[in-house]
From Swiss-Prot:
SUPFAM superfamilies: NagB/RpiA/CoA transferase-like. GO terms for biological process: carbohydrate metabolic process; glucosamine catabolic process; N-acetylglucosamine catabolic process; N-acetylneuraminate catabolic process. InterPro entries: Glc/Gal-6P_isomerase, Glucosamine6P_isomerase, Glucosamine6P_isomerase_CS, NagB/RpiA_transferase-like. It comes from Ligilactobacillus salivarius (strain UCC118) (Lactobacillus salivarius). The lineage of its organism: Bacteria, Bacillati, Bacillota, Bacilli, Lactobacillales. This is Glucosamine-6-phosphate deaminase.
Length: 234
């Protein structure tokens, strides 16, 4: 695990840009992407840069169940606003939040992920150690699945919605087993509220109770953290 400590999230975005450029230069074709406030500065830096994804493919970690792609709170909309409109990929894939059959949708996405092997996977980490929507207790062998969001995750996501009642209660998420197949994983964490999760991920035992701790078993992980997120590390 390579740990890069930065002053703040803006500097973190600049470091992440270097990782993306190195991946492209080394021939990576498929990029696994994440959403939320953590990768926003990374996408800002990608948009400002001369990086070209026109021959690349993107696959996203997750999507809310029940939100149309044009819904402003959907992850499909987020990706367009923050990255795809300015830096289009040859192909971009997300789970379909409006799929009628959840099992079929998970199967479809897994087949897609087998076809497009992820060279670089971008991750954030939840306060409870989740990666994607793989909450504590998730199987380390998991594939794409429909997951009921924990109350802590619903609370954390409620800031993006007018009312907490509007926050979706389910999401489709890439499984931990699938995430671990990525050649390289880039995890970002910023802010004091991520410090406990970061400590558990890096220094704690590998346990399903801290899903991100499984990254200790991956051969090529880059962690970008700011001073606050790193504050509890030895």
């Amino acid at each position: 695990m390579k740990i890069i400590k930065v002053k703040d999230q803006v500097e973190g975005g600049k470091e992440a840009l270097k990782v993306f450029k190195e991946a492209l230069d080394s021939g990576v074709k498929v990029f696994g992407l994440a959403t939320g406030s953590t990768p926003e500065t990374t996408y800002d830096e990608l948009v400002k840069s001369d990086i070209d994804f026109s021959n690349s493919i993107s696959v996203n970690l997750d999507e809310y169940v029940g939100l149309k792609p044009e819904d402003e709170q959907s992850y499909a909309y987020f990706m367009k606003e923050h990255l795809f409109n300015a830096k289009p990929f040859a192909k971009s894939f997300l789970p379909n939040g409006m799929a009628e059959d959840a099992d079929q949708e998970c199967e479809r996405y897994d087949k897609l992920l087998e076809e497009y092997h992820v060279g670089l996977q971008l991750l954030g980490i939840g306060r409870n150690g989740h990666i994607g929507f793989n909450e504590p207790g998730s199987s380390f062998d998991g594939k794409t699945h429909k997951v009921a969001l924990t109350q802590s995750t619903i609370n954390a996501n409620s800031r993006f919605f007018d009312n907490e009642e509007d926050v979706p209660k389910y999401a489709y998420s890439m499984g931990i087993g699938t995430i671990m197949k990525s050649d390289t994983i880039l995890l970002e964490a910023f802010g004091k509220n991520k410090a406990e999760a970061v400590k558990a991920m890096i220094e704690g035992p590998v346990t399903p109770e801290v899903p991100a701790s499984v990254l200790q078993n991956h051969p090529d992980v880059v962690v970008i953290i700011d001073e606050e997120a790193a504050s509890l590390l030895k």
